[in-house]
């Protein structure tokens, strides 16, 4: 239920929400519109509490686990006693015989804020974490020819170093022959943010738990 309260000489709608079971892709604006009759344009004062043992997760790296893109002037208090976790990126495809590995996919963000003043209280044992970036694919390897010099040694070997970042799902190829060309592994994907600010955000962060990733 939305209740009007006076704040700074203005009427501001207020409500409290408790999340008591695991949820994916929680959208605060949609939740308020669908369940509380909020019109989506008036500023609102809302407190959201995530219970201990509850996980808010994202279904894809292109979505966030907890989204609060609100009307300007909104005040949010987010009490997290559980886990808010972004989606991890996929590993890059390993290279073929004549190519390097592909880069890993960037991880998704855990929380996204827009147009609000927010206080985040992350309790002891609670977690807010962006999704980890996927490992880069391992580089391929190509053997070329079997040239031998007068002393019986192979010549002409060429090696290309692996790319930056971990190679999570890929394994570098190996080849035999006199000249072996090893192609670089792909770069690891970037980690998602714990908290992303789109625009118009004033944030106070009180952290007694774990936060993995950037917070703005």
Q: What is the predicted function of each stretch?
A:
Residues 1-43, 201-216:
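Enriched but not universal
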Residues 16-20, 41-56, 76-79:
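Glycine-rich repeat segments that build the extracellular carbohydrate-interaction surface of secreted
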Residues 36, 68-69:
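Leucine-rich repeat
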Residues 53-63, 69-74, 81-113, 123-198, ...:
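Glycine-centered low-complexity coil/loop motifs and glycine-rich tracts
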Residues 118-122:
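Ankyrin repeat structural motif
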